[in-house]
């Protein structure tokens, strides 16, 4: 809910037709609707204990009202719906997700990181500062890698790493411990990763929030304080082969 409120604050008294450069073709209006409807989509999946895909266009109350105050209330309401649905249904209740059946509370974590990254999109579009607690940013990297490990190479697409190459990420924020390190490689034809320390063919070192924005292509490395060591081509291949 805190992330939802922080996202909403960026949309008070803004020009909703402002383009969002990190989401090509989108405006702030579309980004706002996407986030609000996404929370309601997840809430409906959980509340109805769905075991198959739900078309987001059919979500109940999927469009915000036209007045700004009503739209903000609609946004907050979507996040609350998800929390309520998980509590009512049970955190371990199996439901549909785009990665297969997962416990209902999987959606809370997914939506937290979805909204955080889209808050970064809005902040970049508006030229505003973006901050995120390092532990949240680090978990965002972990959650994203969990998805990449499942989805990369699907439908015959090339893997974002070549056999024998490794990528190491190191978040320098105090207190993260092993949760702030990720070593990514190819094992048995699939992307695999762990929190163990290692030396990669390419390595990135910097704050967790800047690392998150870099791997999700929200900020080019040149606009961050993240340091890149090793083979630039490994990093570029990784960027080109992974989703936004």
Positions of predicted regions on the chain:
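Acidic/His-leaning functional-site neighborhoods
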Residues: 172-208
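Short, contiguous alpha-helical
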Residues: 15-55, 98-155, 211
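Short, Lys/Arg-rich amphipathic segments at extreme N-termini
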Residues: 1-21
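C-terminal interaction segments
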Residues: 197-244
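Hydrophobic alpha-helical segments and helix pairs
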Residues: 71-119
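Alpha-helical packing segments of well-folded alpha/beta enzyme cores
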Residues: 3, 7, 38, 67, ...
